[in-house]
């Protein structure tokens, strides 16, 4: 049964798993495409605006399930948020000390970013809170966040295996720490910095590799004095946030699927407008260029404190490459798309140092390796990466494991298939890219959406 889903409605988990796509060869991609707003920035913008003194306007807000979950949680905590347009939020901030207790668990849905950042915020409040998530989020590791928060004096419980739900006990006095993060994670860094706003003395976060600095840039935009150097951020507690207006650029991770698709579908020529090019986010762009992609930047400017460009992408034959390990953290969300580019390239592409892929919304490493093998692509899997041997892409049925990025990646593979690719469990695409199917088809994708009532 063909269906058209509304991204504004959250179907029950028992029903979501029956949504599937049939992807097949379409036409060369053409057009000027507007990608939805950045998910990471949208989470932070609505959260920091809620903590600010005064009213903030957010334009370009991503109207997707993950970001709406965060906004709904803030509303439950007493923040008034207006929605004049689907991509706009007017947030009436309550100040750093104005949040109110919720008497029911706070549902983050599939939003790992939302849960981890909210944990950093809620450990500093005078009331107890419980953060829960969907089946996928409930399997993701949280001790990497709860451990440093506990070092600051927070009381926070997880399940026995370190996964959600998170039970947070309010009324704790936090103190700043000098935290050396064992992994490069902007979410860990952001959670600790948020708690640091409420802590005595100074909070320092040091990373093994610099990660995306959305939190640091946005705290600065909201008037917080934060010192940033390579791989290190520090701030003093007790600061207040001042309301400001934010314009959010297009999400690079969402644009990534079109960067890859236009690069591998012969005859394609598209332009992606106003894409955020945070320096710690664009590893995929570097790797695609190493592979021979034809991607040209224009109209560079700043938007919401972030560098923004238009990207023109034209088809070019790709060659396999070795992905530099120092780029892995800068493209951790883009690896599913890269794996498809590698499958379409001539020669071998080698990925290493990417063990973090195993603890995303799914084990993305295993999911991509298994899926590509189903389509006849030779892939050698390792503990922290894979070697992908480029070649023809066949047909088959792919289990996306409810992971939005796995589903979208294999929709690209379907454009190169000798037949069709069926991609199952795709409803969670709405968590990051509402109306992905509509935009993809308008650009030239062969992509049909079905609901299996069984």
From Swiss-Prot:
Pathway: Metabolic intermediate biosynthesis; chorismate biosynthesis; chorismate from D-erythrose 4-phosphate and phosphoenolpyruvate: step 6/7. SUPFAM superfamilies: EPT/RTPC-like (SSF55205). It is found in: Cytoplasm. 3-phosphoshikimate binds at residues 39-40, 44, 185, 187, 333, 360. PANTHER family: AROM/DEHYDROQUINATE SYNTHASE (PTHR21090), PENTAFUNCTIONAL AROM POLYPEPTIDE (PTHR21090:SF5). Monomer. This is 3-phosphoshikimate 1-carboxyvinyltransferase. It comes from Xylella fastidiosa (strain 9a5c). The gene is aroA.
